[in-house]
Amino acid sequence: MSEKPIVRMAELEIDPDTIETYRALLIEEIEASVALEDGVLSLNAVSIKDHPNIIRILEVYADRDAYEAHLQTPHFLKYKKETSDMVTSLTLIDVDPIAMRSKP
């Protein structure tokens, strides 16, 4: 494993007609990823107030290997396949963390 954590922000726009189904699939994928993958340190999804179809996901992986492994998991591949027609826009942004803290 490499040493540097991978942190990225995913910015998505979802077809408003599919938002409830999309959210259910996103929750399922996040819960599986955090529970089953040691290298997935954190996945946090939020929507923009008054624009529930605009989603932001802060993703934190232990390292590049963990991120690459995540992309090949059955639960992630299922999520990508089942949501592909729901996502109207996707931007992935690599970010440098400044301060990230949480309580257990």
Feature annotation, model-predicted:
Residues 28-41, 60-93:
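An amphipathic, aromatic/His-enriched active-site/gating alpha helix that lines ligand/cofactor pockets
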Residues 2, 6-36, 41, 45:
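N-terminal first-folded block
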Residues 5-13, 42-71, 93:
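Short, well-ordered beta-strand segments in beta-rich or mixed alpha/beta enzyme
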Residues 1-6, 44-53, 80-104:
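Glycine-rich beta-strand-turn "strand-cap" elements at beta-sheet edges
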